[in-house]
Amino acid sequence: MEFFYILILIILYFINSQQYTPVYDIIGNISLFNIPITEDKYYETVIDSLIELMENYAFIKILKSPPKVNGSDYFNKVDIIQDLKNLKSTINETTPNFYEFYQDISKIIASSQDFHIIFTYIGQKAPFDMLGKLIISSPIEIFIKKDKKVLANLNSVIYKLNNETQVKNSDIISNYYKNKTYLTKINGKNVYQYLREFCADYCRYKSKNSKFIFNKVNFGGFYLWQCPLTFDELKEFSITYENGLTLSSNYIGFIKNSQNDNLKNTELSFNNFYNIKNKFFEEPIITSQEKENKVTWDINIDNHIKCKVDHKNEINVIFQNSFNPNPSDPLGIINNFSYCHGNFSNNDYPLIVIESLNGGGFAQLSKLMQQMVQDLMYPKNYYSVIHNKNTKQFLYDNKDSFIFVNDYETNNLTIDEFYNDIVSEKYGNITIERSKQKIAVDLNFESLIKNNIFKRNSTKKPTDIIIFTDGLSFSSTSVFIKNVYYFGGAILVGYSGDPEAELFDASQNPTFVLTNLTGIKGFIELIKRGFYFPRIPSGAMYRTKYDINNENIPEEFTVNLIDERINIYNDYSDDLYEDFISEAKIIFEKYKKSCNPNNKYLNFLNEDCSFAEGHLHGGYKCGDDGTWNKTCVPFYCDEEYYFEPNEKKCIPLKEIKRDSSDNSISFAFLFIVLGVIIVVLIIIIVYYKRKNKNELDLQEIKEELMQN
């Protein structure tokens, strides 16, 4: 859950909104804290604490021998625990400087390729808090044209932070952008290759496209703790244009003009990292090249959720980049989904969904999105927990958030029944034990279904729905995209990302973030030493379409390829609206007759297809020749039933039975949110009350938390 992170961001934002002071001598400032920490066994304690936490990571063993993709090594093969132990052994021989230590340990964590793992240093006192304060911006921002050529403009971030900042060769850079003189190299490397490598050691995403996006955004501006580049990497760099001119330029650093720095505690995910920049700088970092086109949306919630019925183009449109609710109106996002769904249901227009830099959020909102976009399907998510050190306790800690059930059964399983139904699996020479995957029922979502918030009002054909994804689509966004994909409920279209990438994964990291580390000693030890609320996910999602008895690969390690890719290589902004509409029209027309022969999930709905079972409906699948096979195949059911894909039959929806203690479960969402907020604020208060002390007593912290 990332709701409380957003709350902290907003609170801290309003506390302090002063201007930033430019730092031209970045290396000199970093050198201030590039010294050994004098606390006895500091580095060893940090590593031991991190090992204790990582022992609970869902994929800690699988990463030693991850599944292959199309016979090749697509995922990192790493032994994180051993790498941490190796780092500790080198520390015993030579005491590192703090910055070098932070670089080393950050690379090890990043090798997991999992952004759900939170491990962030914010510092306790000068000079080490500089790592949490310093923002670094390149002098240029990158725009990739449809023909894949690159333009470079002066970085708008710099002037929003301080409009008096001096950028070397700024006049030439600005004029070349206006005259459309294209950039060919950065530091002597092809621009694309440079962006692939920039900050790559610290990028925790799996797909190449998402890494490219992450690096490209970071190139525009990043926090030093997020991307601790070497001194050589932070020196002046060169840019070369197509006419042969090479200019030297420089990074600019910024520090907030306040002791109450509101940046060091904030960016805990890519989504929050990007959105908080919008908060500070008022408009996106990657600004649009043209601002003439103004889109009037029927509803626009903080530029996170926007939808409209475009009568001119006869298309329904929804844009989204977050599944996080507004802290002041946590149920408002559900009402907005309902509003959009109601408007879309009143016409027969096709629908496009634009996912842009979506870092996820609440899983139940992802499920609502699934039903809003494709209401022929009934969302079901299969989850498992890996049997690691504390995962059973995590289940008990989260028992009020969800329940587990077997297929088609009305009685929920006890935690012991779920946890002790064990599956043993081998990955190479690695054996893991986990619980057998079951359907996870989000209690709040079930109450929403019961109230028929998204009752089926019309039947949208899968070929009349396009999901535009930049490939970064992360966490609960990935759950949304994967479930629609496996149902065959929409055409997946890729944009943005690496223009030269051959493989385009539609989404990534649909991890079941089941964790509560506050009872683990290592968690407290890390907070005492300046690290911000570490998080280690312990659950895994499994695909819903296959026989669960034969499916043993977590969705974390599967790749879902897009159906089409368009030549839009920048993040979505409203000036690109008409481009997306134009591309959608072409694709909708194409899929009336043609299809992607590599996607055997996508369905072509044909209402003339009839089946012996009265509630069953279907259509066609794509043939190997890239046209629709005219053989009728069932894939959906009447409302109040859900489609069972293995037996190809309709199962009546039944309300999940609950214990008497669950009578107030429809309010679980609000209570969970409120509880998380209180706990986080208490931890913050406890931490800052004690941060200036050299020693923090672990038992005292636990007692204070329990009393509160």
Language model: regions and residue ranges:
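Membrane-proximal cytoplasmic juxtamembrane segment of single-pass cell-surface glycoproteins
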Residues: I685-L705
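Single-pass type I membrane-protein transmembrane alpha-helix
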Residues: V673-R690
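Extracellular juxtamembrane-to-transmembrane boundary of type I single-pass membrane glycoproteins
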Residues: K654-V673
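Extracellular, cysteine-rich, disulfide-stabilized repeat modules with beta-strand cores
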Residues: K600-N603, G614-K630, Y641-K648
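Disulfide-rich extracellular modules and peptides
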Residues: Y205, P597, F611, D624, ...
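Cleavable N-terminal signal peptides of Sec/SRP-targeted secreted and luminal proteins
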Residues: E2-Q19
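Flexible, low-complexity junctional segments that flank or bridge functional domains
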Residues: Q18-T410, I466-I467, A506-T515, S582-K585, ...
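Conserved acidic, small-residue-rich alpha-beta core segments centered on
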Residues: F362-E578
